[in-house]
Amino acid sequence: MRKNLLVFVFAAAIACTSAPVFGAPKVSSLAGTLIEEGYTPLTLKRAGNEFYVSCKLNGRPASLIVDTGAARTLIGSGLLKALGLPLTKGEENVYGMIGWAGKNIKAGEIKDFQVGPYQAGAHPVSAWDFSYFGSAGRGSSMDGLLGIDFLHRHQAVIDCFRMHLFLKAPSAPSTSATLSAGLRAGGCTEIPMKPVSHRGLTVPARINGRSGYFVVDTGAAHTLLSQNAIAGLNMRLVSASRFWTRLGVQDVGKNVSVIQKVHFTTMEIGNFSVPPQWVGVADLPHSTSGGTENVFFGYVGHDLLACYVGIIDCAALKLFLRFDPVIDAARRKSRG
């Protein structure tokens, strides 16, 4: 019964997506179904180019970016100091779109971790200096990243199109099989994700016939390809406008000063074909390790995830994408 209900309501939700990306209804039938399954719904907030969720850490308000590109939950060192949180030397390195956070950085535990109305209980965190993200012109203040460790444990489902986050207690029964069946019946392509050391959640990909992988990064506003990865693909780079350059620098912090753009002819993410389009290219931080021999293509950002109605099941490690011709037409028009 639940399976049939989800198939029906998601098909109805798809019918509503013929509006432009930012004109869609705020509440979807998918949301109603997940609430019935015991999920707590939260609406992400936009500030600058980032998407936040309001939290309380040991009773203190904080704004955290929902970031599937962060393997661990990172909290600003200043906030942790203000909380008086005891920190010890961690055993793992932290690496991601922000670059190396350092070897064996300090870590601690938030005893009362609350995301909106959702009570998560205790959760480990790592300390990192986010002060440069609050520079002039950004229009936002970031207290940290809600990483995949938290999202996986609390069975998170992220609706990238409607900007919703759903959380459920780790001990609650899984809804992933029902969710998968409903989304596939609604026309979505299911793509397996893999957690990779120093990266976050990754998906297999091909660009112009070359195999590699992307990091699925909800913490990045824009999709960026690695200049190092596409060097041998005979793709013509052109200088980006100042608008693209500014957005790219904001996405990756101090690691990029110049961003270019490139037009790909064929790109597959799993079995999902992405229509030809321009994307940003930058000299992204990369490591020789990371648990994979494949080529690191870059980051699938929120722009592409929203455009192709992305749903992320963090518990089952699955990404769902769907092509909508009206939404894609709006994308092409906005890009000129």
Label the model's feature ranges:
Residues 21-336:
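Pepsin/retropepsin-fold aspartyl endopeptidases
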